């Protein structure tokens, strides 16, 4: 008797469970959050890349980012990992409050708590930071091998998008934490 029907898919070939927090993140975004964290960074990335392309400066922009981003993103990775660790290992009145505050956001048709929402958001930021660092390393590796304008343009769009997405996501997370503890009486 088979309990689970055997299926062949990408998950059988390569580990893909790491995509679930990213899927959960995008599934929980409200329209205004999507515009703030996804659409706006895409628009800015495309416009910025177009300006650099017109000025024939895409390669210098990529090199400039490659010079500063690995260190900055590594620090952000450490900071985000620390925030996740603190969130997951802390207990007390404030954490219990976060766990009790339900949001209108749903995963698997169940409302998630603000605690779960923050965990999803921080996990997404961590994954995006790691992906950005890998993309920068890949771009630097390929720089000496392949010189192609449209690849450079795509890389610049992706890097600008991820930088803005990460920073705006962190900003929204900080805002969520702030307002979850903001006392209504202090207004």
Give the positions of each predicted feature.
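N-terminal juxtamembrane cytosolic/stromal segments of multi-pass membrane proteins
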Residues: 1-40, 44-46
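Hydrophobic alpha-helical transmembrane segments
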Residues: 9-25, 66-77, 100-114
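Long, highly hydrophobic alpha-helical transmembrane signal-anchor segments
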Residues: 31-74, 155
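Alpha-helical transmembrane segments of integral membrane proteins
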Residues: 32-33, 37-41, 100-187
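Juxtamembrane "helix exit" motif at the C-terminal ends of alpha-helical transmembrane segments
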Residues: 44-60, 90, 134-146
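Membrane-helix interface/capping segments
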Residues: 59, 85-106
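Hydrophobic alpha-helical membrane-embedded segments
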Residues: 71-92
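Membrane-spanning helices that line or support transport/gating and their immediate boundary helices
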Residues: 83, 90, 94, 173-181
């Amino acid at each position: 008797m088979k309990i689970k029907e055997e299926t062949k898919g990408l998950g059988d070939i390569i580990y893909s469970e790491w995509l679930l927090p990213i899927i959960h993140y995008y599934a929980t975004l409200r329209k205004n959050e999507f515009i703030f964290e996804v659409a706006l960074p895409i628009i800015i990335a495309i416009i910025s890349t177009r300006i650099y392309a017109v000025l024939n400066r895409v390669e210098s922009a990529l090199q400039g980012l490659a010079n500063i981003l690995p260190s900055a993103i590594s620090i952000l990775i450490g900071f985000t990992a620390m925030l996740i660790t603190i969130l997951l290992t802390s207990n007390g009145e404030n954490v219990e409050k976060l766990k009790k505050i339900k949001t209108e956001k749903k995963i698997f048709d169940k409302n998630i708590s603000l605690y779960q929402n923050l965990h999803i958001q921080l996990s997404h930021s961590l994954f995006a930071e790691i992906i950005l660092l890998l993309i920068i390393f890949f771009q630097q590796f390929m720089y000496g091998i392949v010189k192609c304008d449209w690849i450079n343009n795509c890389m610049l769009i992706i890097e600008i998008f991820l930088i803005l997405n990460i920073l705006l996501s962190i900003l929204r997370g900080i805002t969520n934490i702030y307002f979850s503890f903001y006392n209504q009486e202090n207004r």
